[in-house]
Swiss-Prot record:
Name under which the protein is recorded: MSDIN-like toxin proprotein 10
Transmembrane spans: none
Protein's job: Probable toxin that belongs to the MSDIN-like toxin family responsible for a large number of food poisoning cases and deaths.
Post-translational modification: Processed by the macrocyclase-peptidase enzyme POPB to yield a toxic cyclic nonapeptide. POPB first removes 10 residues from the N-terminus. Conformational trapping of the remaining peptide forces the enzyme to release this intermediate rather than proceed to macrocyclization. The enzyme rebinds the remaining peptide in a different conformation and catalyzes macrocyclization of the N-terminal 9 residues.
Similarity section: Belongs to the MSDIN fungal toxin family.
Gene: MSD10
Chain positions listed as propeptide in the UniProt record: 1-10, 20-36
Keywords annotated in UniProt: Toxin
Residue location of crosslink Cyclopeptide (Gly-Pro): G11-P19
GO MF terms held by the record: toxin activity
């Protein structure tokens, strides 16, 4: 699905407000989200 592409857009897919959109882009990597 194009969900991964949607995450690249700022505040497009991330369910929670994250200052690091880059980390949110890789939602599959929970480690990256934790770093944010």
């Amino acid at each position: 699905m194009s969900d991964i592409n949607a995450t690249r857009l700022p505040g497009a897919y991330p369910p929670v407000p994250m200052p690091c959109v880059g980390d949110a882009d890789n939602f599959t990597l929970t480690r990256g989200e934790n770093l944010c």
